[in-house]
Amino acid sequence: MRTLLIGMIWVYQKVISPLKRPTCRYYPSCSEYALWLFSYSNFWYALLFSLRRILRCNSLFEGGIDYPIISKRITPIFGSPRLIKVWLVPLCPQKDWSAKGKFYLIKSMKVVQC
């Protein structure tokens, strides 16, 4: 199911989106936001927050920068990374322990090979 939705979003981005003018009020765009969530988080969480984002993308809301927030359990890796696709930025570092394990998901504009 996840692969199907990611494929549908990809088709929308490559085929349908170029045919109309850019209208998304947020960065990253709603389709990119959904793509990141479906790629890096739980299916139901991604579905809920993608729908919430799409419903907020109208003239009643201000818009702006809104990175997806994901929950991840990070285990240390002793060695250098081979490929960096995304950056995980802590939601509230060292201040709010209820936010422990929650990160902003920020896509690397250039894939970094180490």
Swiss-Prot record:
Where in or outside the cell? Answer: Cell inner membrane
Work out whether the entry's keyword set contains Hydrolase.
no
Major localization listed first in the record, in broad terms: membrane
Spell out the GO cellular component terms annotated for this protein, sorted alphabetically and separated by semicolons.
plasma membrane
Write out the similarity annotation: Belongs to the UPF0161 family.
Which PANTHER family did the record assign? MEMBRANE PROTEIN INSERTION EFFICIENCY FACTOR-RELATED
Q: What name is this protein filed under?
A: Putative membrane protein insertion efficiency factor
| Originating species | Wolinella succinogenes (strain ATCC 29543 / DSM 1740 / CCUG 13145 / JCM 31913 / LMG 7466 / NCTC 11488 / FDC 602W) (Vibrio succinogenes)
